[in-house]
From Swiss-Prot:
Ca(2+) 4 binds at residues 482, 484, 486, 488, 493. This is Calcium-dependent protein kinase 7. Belongs to the protein kinase superfamily. Ser/Thr protein kinase family. CDPK subfamily. Residues 360-395, 396-431, 432-467, 468-504 form the EF-hand domain. Its EC number is 2.7.11.1. The active site is at 183 (proton acceptor). One of its GO terms (molecular function) is protein serine/threonine kinase activity. It comes from Arabidopsis thaliana. It is found in: Cell membrane. The keyword Transferase applies. Residues 1-29 are annotated as: Disordered. It is an enzyme of class 2 (transferase). One of its GO terms (cellular component) is plasma membrane. Residues 323-353 are annotated as: Autoinhibitory domain.
Length: 535
């Protein structure tokens, strides 16, 4: 459910402005009033067994340290002990579908269920009032995994082995507890503090689920680069976490993802083909043992893929302290930096898009549903959807509409209820035009010159960067995005950056789910999802 921990740069910026005022609960306002579909107020209950109702009795909320699709994370202080924690406050107004509500509920249940572990962020308390859910957890202020690697002067295979051992130990403890993570990626690992010996911690269980041995899942979730082929085939189990860890290992060793393309469909097809490139620099210098582990973690057949326990027994991990201590080269560090930096800029832009759409998406959806639901059954069929969209001036091909209907019809009854219709509406709004990208661009282009200049970039990313490397990072972004080298970023260059590699549409998790469901159906129909040897 987004970054639960602090960005250390925020603390630096705040200290310049004086001591922040504590706020008991930022969600007590009309802006967050919750209404049902008829417009009347009602109390939505999200958590099964919260610690309490009023967080302000036990904690003081301080400055904002992070922001995600659904919530804002604050530094918070235990009034009794003075201990510092992170508090993720999720507005109920943002939880528009049953899926959103279930995600939050399950995230808290999983965090409660997980045993204390040095590499897993721990839950302290949870609160629920009429307007929001508040999740109080361990505070991590040591920064992101890739940022620390880049900051170190010497990056080696031995360092990568130590990181991978930690990540796979997290996977192992999750699987032992009957939890499938489903969203392992570098951004979901933070260091507890700035010390060199700081523990690396898994921070986000927003897409995680409980599973039983042999149980298979079909919901497409996660981030495109890290998705296992069986996720796209919509038939998977906990083996997907080992695949995702294998993708991270590949990136740790060479600085780029193993399966990359300009479009989401291209990424999906590269994942299905599962061809691993060991020719580019620095792979010729990487040990055979490391390459062997990468191959076995990125085995396309989940039955043949190593388990987390088997990864930890692999010679490269067992002998992590003896792994080559020779630098992997400046190229790998530069790639990792670029990967991390571009994620920061995209995250900032996605946040602008998400904040804009959060208001826009809700407008008119209820009225549109009621207009299409002519029989007042509380659900609409394909013909009603098609007729309603045509009436609204949306011309969608029958085949695309059928795919969209199948992707969003969660209960499989051939109709869409209101919750499912919300997902369709969000999907269609984002497909219709690039208005949201224009709005994000305009957010950065503060003087409305038609270009993002270096000062505007610096201002927009102020909260994302620490003072020690900010100028270097800004220069790196400009170098990558400014393709015509005129010292500024045009709208066309901005759009190209947003659409490359990761899908900008992930501004909405619900949309991302439906988008990849739709893509999966297309790939099934054209035969792309068949395993080798299948007919």
């Amino acid at each position: 459910m987004g970054n639960c921990c602090g960005n250390p740069s925020s603390a630096t910026n705040q200290s310049k402005q004086g001591k922040p005022k504590n706020k008991n609960n930022p969600f007590y306002s009309n802006e967050y009033a919750t209404t049902d579909r008829s417009g009347a107020g009602f109390k939505l209950s999200v958590l099964k067994d919260p610690t309490g109702h009023d967080i302000s009795l036990q904690y003081d909320l301080g400055r904002e340290v992070g922001r995600g699709e659904f919530g804002i994370t604050y530094l918070c202080t235990d009034k009794e002990t003075g201990e510092k924690y992170a508090c993720k406050s999720i507005s109920k107004k943002k939880l528009r579908t049953a899926v959103d509500i279930e995600d939050v509920r399950r995230e808290v249940e999983i965090m409660k269920h997980m045993p204390k572990h040095p590499n897993v962020v721990s839950l302290k308390d949870s609160f629920e009032d009429d307007d929001a859910v508040h999740i109080v957890m361990e505070l991590c202020e040591g920064g992101e995994l890739f940022d620390r690697i880049v900051a170190r002067g010497h990056y080696t295979e031995r360092a990568a082995a130590a990181v991978m051992k930690t990540i796979v130990e997290v996977v192992q403890i999750c699987h032992k507890q009957g939890v499938m993570h489903r969203d392992l990626k570098p951004e979901n690992f933070l260091f507890a503090n700035k010390k060199e010996t700081s523990a690396l911690k898994a921070i986000d269980f927003g897409l995680s689920v409980f599973f039983k041995p042999g149980e298979q899942f079909n919901e497409i979730v996660g981030s495109p680069y890290y998705m296992a082929p069986e996720v796209l085939r919509r038939n998977y189990g906990p083996e997907i976490d080992v695949w995702s860890a294998g993708v991270i290992l590949y990136i740790l060793l060479c600085g780029v993802p193993p399966f990359w393309a300009e479009t989401e469909q291209g990424v999906a097809q590269a994942i299905i083909r599962s061809v691993i490139d060991f020719k580019r620099d620095p792979w010729p210098r990487v040990s055979d043992s490391a390459k062997d582990l990468v191959r076995k973690m990125l085995e396309p057949d989940p039955k043949k893929r190593l388990t987390a326990a088997q990864v930890l027994e692999h010679t490269w991990i067992l002998n992590a302290k003896k792994a080559p201590n020779v630098s992997l080269g400046e190229t790998v560090k530069a790639r990792l930096k670029q990967f991390s930096v571009m994620n920061k800029l995209k995250k900032r832009a996605l946040r602008v898009i998400a904040e804009h759409l959060s208001v826009e998406e809700a407008a008119g959806i209820k009225e549109a549903f009621e207009m299409m639901d002519v029989n007042k059954r509380g659900k609409i069929n394909l013909e009603e959807l098609k007729y309603g969209l045509q009436k609204a001036g949306q011309q969608i091909a029958d085949t695309d509409l059928q795919i969209l209907m199948e992707a969003t019809d969660v209960d499989g009854d051939g109709t869409l209820n209101y919750s499912e219709f919300v997902a369709v509406s969000v999907h269609l709004k984002k497909m219709a035009n690039d208005e949201h990208l224009h709005k994000a661009f305009n957010f950065f282009d503060q003087n409305q010159s038609g270009y993002i200049e270096i000062d505007e970039l610096r201002e927009a990313l102020n909260d994302e960067l620490d003072n020690t490397s900010s100028e270097e990072v800004i220069a790196a972004i400009m170098q990558d995005v400014d393709t015509d080298k005129d010292g500024r970023i045009s709208y066309e260059e901005f759009v190209a950056m947003m659409k490359a590699g990761t899908d900008w549409r992930k501004a909405s998790r619900q949309y991302s789910r439906e988008r990849f469901n739709s893509l999966s159906l297309k790939l099934m129909r054209d035969g792309s999802l068949q395993l080798e040897g299948e007919t």
